[in-house]
Amino acid sequence: MLFFYNLKEFLKAFTLLSLVFAFILSLYSVLDVLLLYKTANLRIIPEAMLTTVLVSFYYTAPIINNLSLMLYLKRVFSKSYDKIASTFGISPLRFFAPILIFSLFLSLIQFALSYSFYPYIFKTAYSLEREFRKGKPQEELLLNDLWLSLNNAYIRIGFADLRNKKVHDILLVSLEEGYITELITAEEGYWEGENLRLKNAQINLFEKELQKQADVSIKFIPLEEAKAFGEKLNHLSMGRLISLYFLAGKIGMNRELYLAELLRRLVVSFSNVVILSPMLLALVRERAFLKPSTFLLIYGSIYIFSLNSVKIAAEEFGKNPLIGLVPFLVLSFICARSLYYLSKG
């Protein structure tokens, strides 16, 4: 009975704040469409509102969850329900178990939705902005200065427009026992299946001391996989990220980028429970809201810093993004410690 009462009261607070949050964002979205979009088409307003709310909720759910906790505890503390429960030997962990279970459930739901649902929402929001706000009807699938290793060869593509399958400024260097055996350069070419077709390529075969000019076909990777490399990472499903992680390793690309995006989704999803647990302990101990509010700012900052540090480690330094995960792991340790103290009362 106590379990369902606490769950009901917390869900009231969570629903109220979520609705307020959604209303403010919806209003912002409508004004954004009417005032800033080049094509103020009224039919896109519902879609723009929905994508804005969902994209924002994805990142701010941990904050809404903790604000809901504070709103819920205001009622609990005013009635001293937790103190009454403690006289019957009920620990804070047991008393607040419904809130912790809900937060864990919310984390799991967010993580499951980040497999393909949220990437679809991010892509839709991006497409709407490009088409109606910036007047660009299609997503650009461009690759610049791309270096790949394939078997015993290195391929450089200066520029590729994956929408029309064209590539420009191509260089291929074949090696054998550390020596260059073949050098192929071409100004332009195009993708055909798993092959790159190069027009009027300059071919140098050093072992045979032969130089010639001809059209060449190079076995490469399928265009669809190349398109994935040109897409924004948050538009890719988790399954695609995992496959690209292994593929990038085989062809010499920076595969850490794809691991970083997976870790970012993990951080966003499980921050719902990781931040709430130490906040709950601080609120129960203080039975006030000023000092715990400071903790919320600190934990929220660690959350944002973790998202950025994971990305920077992979993108800027080409390092394993697990290095950037350290702040979140520290926060996770604080979460586990908080649960222990809550169980002890």
Predicted regions and their residues:
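Non-transmembrane, extracytosolic/lumenal segments of membrane-associated proteins
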Residues: 43, 47, 103-207
